Amino acid sequence: MNLHHGAATASEARGPMPGRLGAAPPRLGNVNFHEVTIRLGARAQPRLILDRISLDIPSGQFVCVLGPSGCGKSTLLNALAGFVTPSGGRIAVDGDTITTPGADRGVVFQDPTLFPWKTVLANVSLGPLLAGVASDEAERIGRKLLGRVGLSSRCESFPKHLSGGMQQRVGIARALANNPRVLLMDEPFGALDAQTRSMMQHVLLDVWAEVGVTVLFVTHDIDEAVTLGDRILIMSASPGRIIDDIVVPIARPRADDVMFLAEFNHIKRRCFDHIRRESISAFAQQHEV
């Protein structure tokens, strides 16, 4: 089942947004999952985690993924990152089959995992350096990205001197440093307080609007998904399947009071009903006698 109805609508409404890191070529980032199945665990009795996922994400679109705990949201993201190999089916970015991690896909986790012995600038510049970029150009890229996330004044700071929100901003800048076509985010704001989370959402949307990268964003927070996404994918209880694909037609840029719109709350209720039903199903599965 290929659930991408209406997918181009939100993306086309925004128009194309090529990458703008100077010499970098225009960014694509069209993502395709075709009948992707993933089984994990002991070889004798592998557990079915994802069941025949088919999905198209056009370049530059911001897609959020919601579902009950244990449904395979992170596995879906890790498969696109190249960290998990599908048992069946195919994952591709711009037609190229994904088999391993690559610089064309940047990843941001809930824990920023910065190198504590390196400065903020050195953390962000490391990716380009490892890719063979000259040190002065890598530093230029790092400074530009840190400016985009509002940390120009903290280039020479060490991670231990930054708040959780600041560290996550560094993590976003680092993930973008190699000019990826796709940005993968696994509950990146889950450990932050409500005010910092809201601020980080605005930072992310500003950077995304400027850079134009395709985003796949995993979250447990329905409000966050509706605030950020062009689309919201709802996953079933394990094994994970996509049971709804919701286009969010709210115009961008989205105001601070977007959550008070009737359309926002209509989508929120639709998501809530799905998550509640699937969470009950997951609970029942876990407590079967």
Regions found by a protein language model. Name each.
Residues R39, A251-P253, R277, S281:
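Active-site/binding-pocket entry motifs
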Residues L129, V247-A251, R276:
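A generic structural signal for secondary-structure junctions
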Residues M1-G15, G19, V258-V289:
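Non-catalytic connector elements of ABC transporters
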Residues L228-I234:
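Conserved catalytic segment of ABC-fold P-loop ATPases
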Residues M235-R270:
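Conserved beta-strand-loop-alpha-helix hinge in the C-terminal portion
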Residues V93, I234-M235:
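Short hydrophobic beta-strand elements within the C-terminal catalytic ATPase subdomain
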Residues G15, G19-D223, L228:
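ABC family nucleotide-binding domain
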